[in-house]
């Protein structure tokens, strides 16, 4: 988003100096050209935010909550990356594990990641065509309702609908 690291850290210093005790950092995994070094850079940045808290907070007894959240890159039409493929779920999970392991020892840093199944389905429909209309109808006829709510989401229902319509989700998400 064109935000310099120093600008982010200065904002954290200002917030911590003013008594704030929590920061949430959001990132996307799986962007084109991303490397393991980039993924580990997220952990490094979170640690730098923690250092800002240590340097600036007037009352360390309260503690600090730094939350790092990641989602899986979904290529969308009319964006700079519309023609780039979504990385396979196994690669996304490997990167999640890499970051989780890098943050494991940092008690003040919590790591959350987005469910890969919903992101995969989002990529399919973001890059889909008219053939997916039949998939939508089939999934709906088989009980898909309120699927953006995690308690109602059934990934297998959607995969069954794709299969019943003779379509492969990877064709849309990973091409």
Q: Residues of each region from the PLM?
A:
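Active-site lining segments that contact anionic ligands and/or coordinate catalytic metals
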Residues: 20-28, 63-67, 106-108, 143, ...
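Short, compositionally biased low-complexity segments
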Residues: 14-21, 67-73, 165-174
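A glycine-rich phosphate-binding loop feature that marks nucleotide/adenosyl-phosphate handling sites
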Residues: 28-31, 59-75, 111-126
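Flexible helix-coil linker/hinge segments at domain or subdomain boundaries
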Residues: 54-58, 100-110
